[in-house]
């Protein structure tokens, strides 16, 4: 039997992480910085390498397959609306991506390095050092990625691009950045001042907007949720 409280907390976490994900893809022109300079050298990438695109809030991951091709997981609402590969294989727009996150539908797809990077620099195999895990052979990594190509369920917390890459590279799907996000939120929740602050904001909204269902319910539910989870 599912725990309603845990489901509610999970939903809140996913919505907060979604905001960061939206900011991740809100700027940049594929493959170049503002001065038009290329931020990476494709010839230095090896088949099976993990490519990382660091941003302010999140890092996007992919597996290099060779020949300027990168396999990566991308949310895309169009996958739930049409089977036309001519449309779904086009570069995923921000609108398609955001709705895909909400709809929890994605695909592990192949794009060019330029489209994958989306205007940012690329780090190579940085996870090997940060996770201190032994990587599989590069060819096995690439083959694992190729076998997973296609539509897949999506979750910012439980099945994202980092889970895909770590499974291919190390054999175990993990997402340190999602775990870190949850830990930070947990710290905030455990701080009882968060309960007081949310209660004050709730009362302020009732005072300013009046006693209605859309002000009263959040004013009661959010402090209660933080108190129970703390």
UniProtKB/Swiss-Prot annotation:
<dbReference type="GO" id="GO:0005791">
    <property type="term" value="C:rough endoplasmic reticulum"/>
</dbReference>
<dbReference type="GO" id="GO:0005783">
    <property type="term" value="C:endoplasmic reticulum"/>
</dbReference>
<dbReference type="Pfam" id="PF04970">
    <property type="entry name" value="LRAT"/>
</dbReference>
<keyword id="KW-0812">Transmembrane</keyword>
<dbReference type="GO" id="GO:0006776">
    <property type="term" value="P:vitamin A metabolic process"/>
</dbReference>
<keyword id="KW-0808">Transferase</keyword>
<comment type="function">
    <text>Transfers the acyl group from the sn-1 position of phosphatidylcholine to all-trans retinol, producing all-trans retinyl esters. Retinyl esters are storage forms of vitamin A. LRAT plays a critical role in vision. It provides the all-trans retinyl ester substrates for the isomerohydrolase which processes the esters into 11-cis-retinol in the retinal pigment epithelium; due to a membrane-associated alcohol dehydrogenase, 11 cis-retinol is oxidized and converted into 11-cis-retinaldehyde which is the chromophore for rhodopsin and the cone photopigments.</text>
</comment>
<feature type="topological domain" description="Lumenal">
    <location>
        <begin position="216"/>
        <end position="230"/>
    </location>
</feature>
<keyword id="KW-1133">Transmembrane helix</keyword>
<feature type="topological domain" description="Cytoplasmic">
    <location>
        <begin position="1"/>
        <end position="194"/>
    </location>
</feature>
<dbReference type="GO" id="GO:0047173">
    <property type="term" value="F:phosphatidylcholine-retinol O-acyltransferase activity"/>
</dbReference>
<keyword id="KW-0716">Sensory transduction</keyword>
<dbReference type="GO" id="GO:0005771">
    <property type="term" value="C:multivesicular body"/>
</dbReference>
<dbReference type="GO" id="GO:0042572">
    <property type="term" value="P:retinol metabolic process"/>
</dbReference>
<feature type="active site">
    <location>
        <position position="72"/>
    </location>
</feature>
<feature type="active site" description="Acyl-thioester intermediate">
    <location>
        <position position="161"/>
    </location>
</feature>
<keyword id="KW-0012">Acyltransferase</keyword>
<dbReference type="GO" id="GO:0007601">
    <property type="term" value="P:visual perception"/>
</dbReference>
<keyword id="KW-0844">Vision</keyword>
<feature type="transmembrane region" description="Helical">
    <location>
        <begin position="195"/>
        <end position="215"/>
    </location>
</feature>
<feature type="domain" description="LRAT">
    <location>
        <begin position="50"/>
        <end position="177"/>
    </location>
</feature>
<comment type="pathway">
    <text>Cofactor metabolism; retinol metabolism.</text>
</comment>
<keyword id="KW-0472">Membrane</keyword>
<dbReference type="InterPro" id="IPR042288">
    <property type="entry name" value="LRAT"/>
</dbReference>
<dbReference type="InterPro" id="IPR007053">
    <property type="entry name" value="LRAT_dom"/>
</dbReference>
<feature type="active site">
    <location>
        <position position="60"/>
    </location>
</feature>
<keyword id="KW-0256">Endoplasmic reticulum</keyword>
<keyword id="KW-0967">Endosome</keyword>
<protein>
    <recommendedName>
        <fullName>Lecithin retinol acyltransferase</fullName>
        <ecNumber>2.3.1.135</ecNumber>
    </recommendedName>
</protein>
<keyword id="KW-0963">Cytoplasm</keyword>
<keyword id="KW-0443">Lipid metabolism</keyword>
<dbReference type="GO" id="GO:0005789">
    <property type="term" value="C:endoplasmic reticulum membrane"/>
</dbReference>
<comment type="similarity">
    <text>Belongs to the H-rev107 family.</text>
</comment>
<dbReference type="GO" id="GO:0048471">
    <property type="term" value="C:perinuclear region of cytoplasm"/>
</dbReference>
């Amino acid at each position: 039997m599912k725990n309603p409280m845990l489901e509610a907390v999970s939903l809140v976490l996913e919505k907060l992480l979604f905001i960061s994900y939206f900011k991740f893809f809100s700027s940049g022109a594929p493959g170049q910085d503002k001065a038009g300079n290329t931020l990476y050298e494709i010839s230095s990438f090896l088949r099976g390498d993990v490519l990382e695109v660091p941003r302010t809030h999140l890092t996007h991951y992919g597996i290099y397959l060779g020949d300027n091709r990168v396999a990566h997981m991308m949310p895309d609402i169009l996958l739930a609306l049409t089977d036309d590969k001519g449309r779904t294989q086009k570069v995923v727009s921000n609108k398609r991506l955001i709705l895909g996150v909400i709809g929890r539908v994605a695909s592990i797809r192949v794009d060019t390095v330029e489209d994958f990077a989306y205007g940012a620099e690329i780090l190579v195999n940085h996870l090997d050092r940060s996770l201190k895990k032994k990587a599989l052979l590069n060819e096995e990594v690439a083959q694992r990625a190729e076998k997973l190509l296609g539509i897949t369920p999506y979750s910012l917390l439980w099945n994202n691009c980092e889970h895909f890459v770590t499974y291919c590279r190390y054999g175990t799907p993990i997402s340190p950045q999602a775990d870190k996000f949850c830990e930070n939120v947990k710290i905030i929740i455990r701080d009882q001042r968060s309960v007081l602050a949310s209660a004050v904001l709730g009362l302020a909204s009732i005072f300013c907007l009046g006693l209605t269902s859309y002000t009263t319910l959040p004013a009661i539910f959010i402090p209660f949720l933080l108190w129970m989870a703390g």
